[in-house]
Amino acid sequence: MYEDKINSAVAQQQALLDPFFIAHQEVLAGFAAHLTTTFQNGGRLFLAGSGPFAAIASLLGQQFLHRQTLERPSLPAVSLTHDAGLATFLAAEDQASQLFSRQLRALANDQDTLLLLAGTTLSPADREVLTTARQIGCRTALICAVHTELADTMPELLLQLPTDSLPRLLEGTLFAGHLLCALVEGELFGI
């Protein structure tokens, strides 16, 4: 019984990743090249994600900042997801949708990039940070499910995972983020 569940989860993940990376290989390589240039020119990467994607945004930010595979200089990456005090303060004033956008507006400039991680829906905070990033002049990227309703919040770079399963979305998003970090590390530090 356990073996069947394990085999099913592995098969689902393979069915997700194979078409995703075939369809998005050039986009991922282009985004990695953009981030490499951004870091070389003094720009920063800001990461955001709501719900369970906040943890992934935080982890990926740490891997860019500290390291993923080797000892190297820090890369300027900032996760906007871990300020619990600000989240509580804004929620108390019915301004929870400003959690990411307030931080981005205070910290970012037009040399920076925002990477937003989302599931099958965009939260009000997700939508607002995309809008704010565009107003500032940041480059915007989004990793989300293929059926996510974007409406007027279309990012410049869109990577859509072909599933609506939350566990598979989380795993696929984390894998894509790890790959992105590895590509940037490889280009900047020769690994």
Residue ranges and their predicted role:
Residues 1-23:
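Generic N-terminal amphipathic, Lys/Arg-enriched alpha-helix
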Residues 34-108:
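Glycine-rich, small/polar surface segments that engage phosphate groups of diverse ligands
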Residues 144-191:
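Short alpha-helices
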